């Protein structure tokens, strides 16, 4: 069983896309936290040539050491 999960959110560039992905990442983190996950890291990255912004969320699964 995996102890760590990495979630990815992808949004295309448009007005307020950075705020939208931040809010979606925050909502996902809160939802997973209530399920027992613990946050390890959040990283935002921009793919200049593809026109997307990504959020990578690393969380520790519940009841793992």
Feature map (PLM): residue ranges:
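Terminus-proximal functional modules
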Residues: 1-65
